[in-house]
Regions:
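Structured catalytic-domain cores with a bias toward divalent-metal coordination
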Residues: 2-358
C-alpha cells in the first residue's frame, strides 16, 4: 500500500510478516522518480505487542545507467554515514542523475536508535550477519533483504563506517585485495575517486559475515570508510563523506563531470597482522602518538596504566612495524586484547590500476 508523508513525495511500505523481507512488487525499482520507502518489520515489545520498525529506503532512478547502493548505520554508534546519506536523500533530485541511487541511511536502525554497535533487539552485529537469513532474527532478516533485494540490483556498494565509540581513525576509505584483477582495478579507481586522505587496503581480523565479503563474492565493487570515530561527528569527517559521495557519483557517471580538482588519496595497507596492536592488560591507555604520525618498529607509542596495581610501572606499547598510525583506541579505559592501535604502510597500487582482463 502507499502512504503519503507530508515532507516527502511518496512512501511505500515494504511489509513482512512470517516470511522473507521483500518488496510487494518491483515497480519502485523499475520506474523513474524519487521514492521514499519504508521497510516495515513487525517488532513486538513489552510496550507494543503489535508494533513495527520502519527502515527507510530511498530509491532515485532516472533511466538506464550504473546503479549504486549507499548504506550507513551498519553499526549504531557510527554517525558520518547516516548524516551524510540523510542529506543526500534530501538534496539529490531525479533529474540530477543518470542511472539509479539507492540509499539506506540507517542499516541497523535499532542500533542507531540505541546508539550501540550491536542491535539491542537480538544482540547481533549487522556486519557479521550477511548474506542474512530470511527465517532468522531481525538483524539477519534485514541483512537478507539488503543482500537479496538491494545488492543484487547494484553495480557498486558503498558502506559508511567510522570508529564508533571504541576507536578513532585517520579518515580513510577501506578496500581489500581481491583475486579478480578487473574487480580489483575498478575498486581501486572507485576508492581513488572518493578522495579520502587515505585509502586503506585492509587485512581484516575476521571477515566472515561482513557486507564487504558478501558483495565482493558476488563480483561487485565494494568500498567502505572509516571516518573518525569516538561517537561524534566532526566538520572534517562529514565534509570528506559528503564530497566523497559526489566524487564517486561523478566517477560512475551517475552525476555529470565537473572541472573541480579532487585531492589525491594516499594508498596504504596493513601488510600483516603485525600492524594490529592489542592491549596486553586492562587499564588506562595513554597514547603518545597522534593519528597520521609516522612510527618506527620498537617505538613506544603508548602506555597502559593499571587501575589496581598502583605500584607497578605502566606497560609500554611498542610498534611492531614501521609505518603510520591510522587507528587508536577511542577511550582511555581498555580491556585486555582490545585493539588499541593499527599501523599501516604505503602501498603502490599502479599494478592494480593497469592489470586487468581488458
Amino acid at each position: 500500500m502507499f502512504l503519503v508523508w507530508k515532507k516527502l513525495r511518496l512512501s511505500k511500505f515494504i511489509f513482512t510478516g512470517n516470511m522473507s523481507l521483500t518488496l510487494t512488487d518491483n515497480q519502485t525499482f523499475n520506474q523513474d522518480g524519487k521514492f521514499i520507502s519504508a521497510l516495515k518489520i513487525p517488532h513486538s515489545t513489552n510496550t507494543s505487542g503489535w508494533g513495527s520498525l520502519l527502515l527507510p529506503v530511498i530509491i532515485i532512478r532516472n533511466g538506464d545507467g550504473p546503479s549504486v547502493l549507499f548504506t550507513g548505520g551498519n553499526h549504531g554508534d557510527e554517525y558520518e554515514g547516516p548524516i551524510a546519506l540523510r542529506k543526500l536523500a534530501n538534496e539529490l533530485k531525479t533529474e540530477d542523475i543518470q542511472g539509479q541511487v539507492i540509499i539506506v541511511p540507517y542499516l541497523n536502525f535499532p542500533a542507531i536508535l540505541a546508539g550501540t554497535r550491536l542491535s539491542p533487539v537480538d544482540g547481533l552485529n549487522m556486519n557479521r550477519s550477511f548474506p542474512g537469513d530470511p527465517d532468522g532474527s531481525m538483524t539477519q532478516k534485514i541483512a537478507d533483504f539488503v543482500y537479496r533485494e538491494l545488492v543484487s540490483r547494484c553495480d557498486v556498494v558503498f558502506d559508511f563506517h567510522s570508529g564508533g565509540n571504541s576507536m578513532i581513525f585517520e579518515p580513510c576509505t577501506v578496500l581489500h585485495k581481491l583475486e579478480d584483477s578487473e574487480q580489483m582495478k575498478k575498486t581501486v579507481l572507485a576508492a581513488k575517486s572518493f578522495s579520502a586522505p587515505i585509502s586503506l587496503v585492509l587485512q581484516e581480523l575476521d571477515n566472515k559475515g561482513m557486507l564487504d565479503t558478501a558483495v565482493e563474492n558476488a563480483k561487485k565493487i565494494f568500498i567502505s570508510t572509516e571516518l573518525g570515530g569516538g561517537g561524534f561527528v566532526s566538520p572534517r569527517t562529514l565534509t570528506i563523506a559528503e564530497n566523497g559521495i559526489r566524487n564517486l557519483l561523478r566517477h560512475l557517471e551517475i552525476l555529470p563531470p565537473d572541472e573541480l580538482l579532487v585531492p589525491q588519496t594516499r594508498f596504504m595497507q596493513t601488510p600483516d597482522f603485525g600492524g594490529y596492536l592489542m592491549a596486553p592488560q586492562e587499564g588506562l591507555y595513554e597514547t603518545l602518538i597522534e593519528l597520521g604520525e609516522s612510527v618506527t618498529k620498537g617505538q613506544v607509542i603508548g602506555r597502559i596504566h593499571s587501575l589496581t596495581q598502583i605500584e607497578d610501572p605502566a606497560v609500554e606499547v611498542r610498534a611492531q612495524i614501521d609505518g603510520v598510525l591510522v587507528t587508536r583506541a577511542g577511550r582511555a579505559q581498555v580491556k585486555i586484547w582490545d585493539t588499541i592501535a593499527v599501523i599501516a604502510t604505503d602501498l603502490d597500487v599502479s599494478d592494480f590500476e593497469t592489470n586487468s582482463t581488458d
